[in-house]
Amino acid sequence: MTWLYVTLGVIFGLILLCLITSLVCFFIVFYSPKRKTLGPDEYEIPPGKIYEPYRDYMISWARKARAMPHEDITITSYDGLTLFGRYVEQTKGAPIEILFHGYRGYGERDLSGAIDRCFSIGRNALIVDQRASGKSEGNVITFGAKEKYDCVAWANYVAQRFGPEQEIILCGVSMGGATVTMASSMELPENVVCTLADCPYSTASGIIKKIIKDLKLPVWLLFPFVKLGARIFGGFKLEDASPLEAVKNCKVPIIFIHGDSDDFIPHQMSDELYEACPSLKKIVKIEGAGHGLAFPTNKEKYYGALLDFEKQWRAYKEQKNAT
């Protein structure tokens, strides 16, 4: 019987090792601890050397956004989390952009500059803290698997509050771009007229594998534990965070914008999404722009792309309403 006990001990040990490794991977990749509260004169910019040249701009945008008249809004997610957003209005009745930030970011830090962009082209802005980020509740980042439902909930909130004539544009950067891309294939209110996906990834699995590879770690060894950690400890499947699958059923016009010098999320991922999308679409590459920096790198081209595509989706909307 000794061999049986040894065998069972080995099996139990392997299972325990797998669970511990998966738990470690879960905490590294998906877990978001309690966020610190910034003081009235404290501001942050995203980590990384590529953002240092834009530090003054980003802090200026955040300071300006904090001082603007605004309304703090909360909604409840489908699984009971309180989600936070900040609404800033320049022109009553103007289109509202609902903006979603990226991985481990939060609205004020990552999206304050988008307020000026929105105002410059006649739009109001609702800046959202995604689940497990900023002032929103939750501790698990799901790479869009659950965030896509939050996006739909925000769109429904705006539609119900502002009425059937209120135009809504879904906008996201990085993971936020992936989130709005996935939401664009779901049941959205008729108010949603367009989606802007800035530097999205095509699949959560793909971008996680890419990062593991960039760290010179064995993808074949670590990724299964990342995937298992998401399932066991995060309560979601990575396969449910696939913009590439979702975009095949995209129901609204969508514009993809990506910096061609993005070394975090390759711009080819936007190409994949563009090719798979059946709806009215446009793709724009910003030369020399790093990750999430397409707008500050070339504002003129960014504005031009948005305004050109607005003409297209308005014509599409008129044609659709006429039929």
What are these regions (language model features)?
Residues 141-162:
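Alpha/beta-hydrolase active-site loop
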Residues 182-236, 245:
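Hydrolase active-site cap/lid region
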Residues 249-251, 256-258, 262:
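Short beta-strand/loop motif that positions the catalytic acidic residue
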Residues 103-117, 130:
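The serine-hydrolase catalytic nucleophile loop
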Residues 263-269:
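Conserved alpha/beta-hydrolase "acid-adjacent" motif
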Residues 12-76:
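An N-terminal hydrophobic leader/cap segment in hydrolases
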Residues 289-303:
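Catalytic histidine-centered segment of alpha/beta-hydrolase-like enzymes
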Residues 118-137:
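Conserved alpha/beta-hydrolase
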